[in-house]
């Protein structure tokens, strides 16, 4: 575990506080108002989404790969959502059976995973047919000048907030086999110009559609949301 990872976890809430007050919190609330049933959230971070989930959520499972973030997430869950289940797991290798969840949530996470296409395939795998992916994510700008700026300064963004702001995330969602049903191009408040482009939206897993190939076979099971045994 790097000092940078520890520092990022310690300072994340302070870094993002201005953006939350200026509109990011409202984006989260609007997105998660539609969450229902068995929900999985990847990259739960410090738990900023917890209080946005409503009574329609039957079960909430949150994954987080980084121990410093995980400790803060566990404290937030205890305070805001004690019925939620928290696990340490990367988005690229979710420890759940196929078809375990009704809704998956990713907010400012797909920009920071090591392998975005694999993470999206995993989300599609654990969602039931007709399941939904709800997302707020950074996006490579459609404006050529801004996109060039994103490419030029992405190293700085990775250094400060551990993410790539120039990924073609919407294309990646579609490539993973999701059908994008709603997308809104937004600007992240209080962010530098090259980090502002983002999307808020939802995508669905086609009912009874063939699955995208995975790197290893996993058994299929209907009951939700059961963790795969270790080993």
Predicted regions and their residues:
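Short alpha-helix
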Residues: 162-177
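Core SAM-dependent methyltransferase catalytic element
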Residues: 185-215, 219-221, 228-231
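A short SAM/SAH-binding and catalytic strip from SAM-dependent methyltransferases
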Residues: 102-115
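Class I SAM-dependent methyltransferase SAM/SAH-binding core
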Residues: 40-93
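A short acidic, Gly/Pro-enriched loop at the edge of an enzyme's catalytic core
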Residues: 92-104
